[in-house]
A protein has these predicted regions:
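Glycine-rich, Arg-bearing micro-motifs that act as flexible, cationic patches
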Residues: 109-110, 115-140
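Short secondary-structure boundary segments
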Residues: 36-37, 119-121, 150
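Short, acidic/small-residue loops that bind anionic groups at enzyme active sites
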Residues: 141-150
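Charged, low-complexity cytosolic intrinsically disordered regulatory segments
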Residues: 41-116
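General small-molecule cofactor/ligand-binding pocket signal
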Residues: 35, 92-96, 147
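Small/aliphatic-rich secondary-structure junction motif
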Residues: 2-59, 86
Length: 150
């Protein structure tokens, strides 16, 4: 095993997944890629046209996104420090934007990872019932082994 991807979102399950991924990377001498995805979807054409009349709200959304990006960068750095404290030296942290499952799959493909480790989540909220969970989509579409951690 050469590369392990740990997808994190700051949840308790994600921290457990990160710890497991770090232990596995250390055991196998693998590189650990720590990935946080800031959820973001570009506006559709219709929404962009509508936004002209709602300029202030769009600015507020952009400010929230910038704040989320800053928090995501901090989360990634904290995760890197956590695994380095465990003695792991080959660690790469990345923060990206987009649909979380799509970004995890894209980074896994582009980096040629051998395993993806992520926290599991129950499908208790209404959004998950309609959209499906990130871990479920990743597990069903990844070209490598996926481990979900509770």
């Amino acid at each position: 095993m050469r590369k392990i991807l740990a997808a994190i979102d700051g949840s308790e399950h994600a921290w457990k997944a990160l710890d497991l991924a770090a232990d596995m990377a250390k055991q196998h001498g693998a590189q650990l890629i720590v990935l946080h995805v800031v959820p973001f979807e570009p506006l559709s054409e219709a929404l962009r046209e509508f936004a002209v009349a709602e300029h202030l709200r769009v600015e507020e959304e952009l400010a929230r996104f910038r704040y989320a990006r800053t928090l995501g960068d901090h989360l990634t750095r904290s995760a890197e420090a956590r695994v380095r404290d465990k003695g792991l030296t080959d660690v790469v942290g990345r923060t990206t934007e987009g649909k979380p499952a799509d970004q995890v799959l894209e980074v896994a493909r582009s980096e040629g990872v051998d395993m993806i480790v992520m926290g599991s989540r129950g499908l208790s909220d209404a959004r998950a019932l309609f959209l499906g969970s990130v871990s479920h989509k990743v597990a069903n579409h990844a070209g490598c082994t996926c481990v979900t951690v509770k």
